[in-house]
Design a protein with these regions (language model features):
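Alpha-helical membrane segments and adjacent membrane-interface helices in multi-pass membrane proteins
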Residues: 41-90
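Pore- and pathway-forming membrane helices of multi-pass small-molecule/ion transporters and channels
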Residues: 23, 36-62, 113-155
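Hydrophobic alpha-helical transmembrane segments
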Residues: 12-16, 69, 73-77, 106-110, ...
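Membrane-interface helix termini and inter-helical loops of multi-pass transporters
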Residues: 93-101, 150-161
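Transmembrane alpha-helical segments of multi-pass membrane transport proteins and ion-pumping complexes
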Residues: 18-31, 54, 76, 80-92, ...
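Non-transmembrane, aqueous-exposed alpha-helical and coiled segments at domain scale
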Residues: 67, 92, 96-97, 103-122, ...
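Alpha-helical transmembrane segments and their membrane-interface boundaries
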Residues: 2-60, 160-170, 174-184
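Short, highly charged, low-complexity non-transmembrane loops/tails of multi-pass membrane proteins
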Residues: 190-201
Length: 201
């Protein structure tokens, strides 16, 4: 019986497919796609964070896409939810008190400490959120999205509208990252080819 060793070969280099998909993210910052006051103003960096995270979590290999999606998406949402809870506490409780800077910073720290408890304890007890890095993708992305003024409904609006817009926007942007990682590999049309001179009896 002849055994032939094989290796994987990219029909289209992933450097090309990845760069092509990355280029599509410019649409996320276009504020002229929808009529005002609506606007598509998603944070592109949120896509790249979870795009890299997709491969770090084990994606990219044959049959690994679905398990990696399951590993990441609920955990990202969990982090996003508690980011929103922290944002509401910082903006609508501490921010409305008119306190001195030292006291405000102290209370800010307490809020962050409290919202991190369900995040960190939850990983011990609930299987779908055990992949801790993905939780913090969502948590950090919410804060950077909100305080940077990004969102699908940005601008000088009601604060509640803006903060919930940031919550939804952050999750959608993070959710696109693993899809981009999957498509990067899929578009490369990877196939197995024999290694030259590897045939053995």
């Amino acid at each position: 019986m002849v055994k032939i060793a094989t290796r994987t070969k990219e029909t289209i280099p992933t450097a090309i497919t990845g760069a092509f998909i990355a280029g599509l993210t410019v649409v996320m910052t276009a504020s002229v796609v929808l009529p005002k006051p609506w606007a598509i103003l998603f944070p592109p960096w949120a896509v790249f964070i979870t795009w890299a995270g997709y491969f770090a979590a084990g994606g990219g290999g044959k049959g690994q896409a679905l398990p990696t999606f399951k590993k990441m998406y609920v955990a990202i949402l969990w982090g996003d939810i508690w980011g929103l809870a922290g944002g509401l506490g910082l903006v609508f409780i501490v921010g409305k008190m008119g306190l001195s800077l030292p006291l405000s910073l102290l209370l800010d720290g307490i809020v962050i400490f409290l919202v991190n408890q369900p995040i960190l304890w939850g990983t011990r007890w609930w299987g779908p959120i055990k992949y801790t890095p993905a939780i913090f993708y969502g948590f950090a992305t919410f804060f950077s999205t909100y305080f940077s003024g990004f969102g699908f409904y940005p601008g000088p609006l009601d604060q509640y509208t803006t903060i919930f817009s940031a919550f939804i926007t952050a999750y959608i942007a993070n959710a696109l990252g693993p899809i981009a990682g999957y498509l990067q590999v899929r578009f490369a049309m990877i196939k197995e080819v024999p290694v030259e001179g590897s045939a053995k009896n």
